[in-house]
Amino acid sequence: QSTIPSDTVCYPAKLLHGHIHRLSRMAVNAVFYPCLTYNVDEGLGDNHYNCPVVAYYPEVIAANCHELENIRFIYDYIGIHRRRDFPRKMTAILAKYFAGISLGEVKGAADAAYAEYAEHMSRVRVRGGEIIAQARAEGRQIIVLAGRPYHADEEINHGIDKLICSYGAAVITEDSISHLVEKFPTSILNQWTYHSRLYAAAKYIADQPDMNLVQLVSFGCGVDAITTDETREILQREGKLYTQIKIDEIANLGAVNIRLRSLFAAIEPASGETPDAE
């Protein structure tokens, strides 16, 4: 706790300090946590940045977590968005910390990693399609639980996905449908990869009568002051409801339950019934 420089930083960032402390107690000889200014370009936005916390929090960790003083902490700047250049630059970075790692080895590992990432995203999209098809066959509402990839962590989302399912609805993530939308104009500069997915998901469900979106927002997230307004505008332009849930280290879901009950009550006329939470 004492290594966290600001209590206003988002909860996922706070958790990193605990991860680093645990790794230091495991006596590891190196920690790889690079800075990533850019994310992969999915063709949905004007640019493809990571948010400042995702991109540069390794700098904060290096300056504040003194248990890393005797551990090789690799927090160099890398660019996974430039696949052609990545192996050469990654080889140069690793050479500063380890001996005997060749360009060929790094290229082979990078090719395998990019292939696995593509396969992972394909599995997410296929599974999302399966859930949508099953929910429609059963006449159930579909909730797009939208946020960042790390919001899928149960420690961070506190089981909100399961709570939504207890109302009888199906749950999918924004990255399972964002690829179904082509880049479109927004009211703001659409320059963050994760945000672009969010806007695309909101655009997609705008004409889907059995779909609604719930946005997860971390307390202390400055850029979500922008995403919430833009997502609300996209949805309300087409007569859709916008529901926001702020999450942090507090695990009590009482307030969340109220928001969800309100959402399902509001969409009752469209669906014909309101599922009851158990």
Show which residues each predicted segment covers.
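An N-terminal assembly and electron-transfer interface module characteristic of large anaerobic redox
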Residues: Q1-E278
